[in-house]
Amino acid sequence: MSIITDVYAREVLDSRGNPTLEVEVYTESGAFGRGMVPSGASTGEHEAVELRDGDKSRYGGLGTQKAVDNVNNIIAEALIGYDVRDQQAIDKAMIALDGTPNKGKLGANAILGVSIAVARAAADFLEIPLYSYLGGFNTKVLPTPMMNIINGGSHSDAPIAFQEFMIVPAGAPTFKEALRWGAEIFHALKKILKERGLETAVGDEGGFAPKFDGTEDAVETIIKAIETAGYKPGEEVFLGFDCASSEFYDNGVYDYTKFEGEKGAKRSAAEQIDYIEELVNKYPIITIEDAMDENDWDGWKALTARLGDRVQLVGDDFFVTNTDYLARGIKEGAANSILIKVNQIGTLTETFEAIEMAKEAGYTAVVSHRSGETEDSTIADISVATNAGQIKTGSLSRTDRIAKYNQLLRIEDQLGEVAEYRGLKSFYNLKK
């Protein structure tokens, strides 16, 4: 009854109006699952391959018909007859079918769409929520959200090198309250920007993208918004950055002029670490992502030695949700946290392996969206299923972001008294 009878993919659009895949999995019992695949703007060079058509006459070359065809003509044929509940076997079968180290033949987008749809079909067959199916009976931790309320770098036209400026309502008693705090700060920020005559249009991830005078102007404006909303920076609400520094790193230089023009500095790795430390000393920063370039291993190790006890240092482009890179980071003492993006690696099985490896090493795992998202809310379920404790899924606007928050509200409601919001305790990698 739980045997797969059909797998079908179609091309749909993501939140940027670019094509992506939607995959449906059908079973003998009528149980059904659907998965949609996100896409990034700033991508790590070691990520699994997102297969695009390259036909410039169609969607500017970004079409996904090749990946769709790979699902409908190759993957479907291989998976029909599998038990939908055997996630690991199905994921491993697709990896073997692809046969490349980076899923470059079939496309990580094709494989991931199927992987998500299979999990959803299994949960539907068992008539249990997705988070319960993926996580089992000990599923209870609601994630502390990192809310990207100012967009810079490759996610906006704002003249700021850092890609994301986030608020982290770690002092809230519940997820529901954390979300309320975030929304109130978001609206306070909008009002402040209007009063300053700055733009209130939002970027790819729902945050504002005004023309600030620089990084510190952005940070101080966020702190003002936190206080205006009635919360205490550094006690109730903390700050986070995604530097996305690989976007402005070139030949050993962190070149801020790429995004900031003449005002921008050019820093060596040592100067970059000094600058990050200055910001940490000055502001209530609890988490920083990709502060160093994805290939600057010496820089990462030096940064971690300097700040690893005080602030969460998250590897995104640095680790690309890949256990090979994470294992090296753990061994060499580089970073203390991994960002988890399902499409960086391409299957749920490999995603869960990365989260497990991080936890065993005392690293945190932050489940994350991509800048090109859909209404699919699977990452909300993954964050709870794994008790990851942290999620990064954008600002308090745009339905593609809110879909994940609303799903977490549902899950918290369903869990009832069992639900646990750990707040600051989710940052168990910090010693000070």
Swiss-Prot record:
Name the cofactor(s) required for activity, per the record: Mg(2+)
Residues the record lists as binding Mg(2+): 242, 289, 316
The EC number of this protein is 4.2.1.11
Q: Which domain of life is it from?
A: Bacteria
Query: Enzyme group, top EC level?
Result: lyase
Keywords of this entry: Cytoplasm, Glycolysis, Lyase, Magnesium, Metal-binding, Phosphoprotein, Secreted, Virulence
Q: What is this protein called?
A: Enolase
What protein family does this chain belong to?
A: Belongs to the enolase family.
The entry lists its GO molecular-function terms as: magnesium ion binding; phosphopyruvate hydratase activity; zymogen binding
Q: Which residues form the active site?
A: 205, 341
Q: Organism classification, top ranks?
A: Bacteria, Bacillati, Bacillota, Bacilli, Lactobacillales
Endpoints of the signal sequence:
none
Described function: Catalyzes the reversible conversion of 2-phosphoglycerate (2-PG) into phosphoenolpyruvate (PEP). It is essential for the degradation of carbohydrates via glycolysis.
Could you mention a single GO BP entry for this protein? glycolytic process
Q: By which gene is this protein encoded?
A: eno
Q: What does the record give as the reaction this protein catalyses?
A: (2R)-2-phosphoglycerate = phosphoenolpyruvate + H2O
Q: Which GO CC annotations does the UniProt entry carry?
A: cell surface; cytoplasm; extracellular region; peptidoglycan-based cell wall; phosphopyruvate hydratase complex
